[in-house]
UniProtKB/Swiss-Prot annotation:
Glycosylated. Keywords: Calcium, Glycoprotein. Residues 1-20 are annotated as: Disordered. The lineage of its organism: Eukaryota, Metazoa, Spiralia, Lophotrochozoa, Mollusca. Signal peptide: none annotated. This is Major extrapallial fluid protein. One of its GO terms (molecular function) is calcium ion binding. It comes from Mytilus edulis (Blue mussel). Homodimer.
């Protein structure tokens, strides 16, 4: 994902803090 480059386990969603 272009938004969350650290975690790509999520879909193309807005910048949201997912699980660590």
């Amino acid at each position: 994902n272009p938004v969350d480059d650290h975690h790509d386990d999520h879909h193309d969603a807005p910048i949201v803090e997912h699980h660590d």
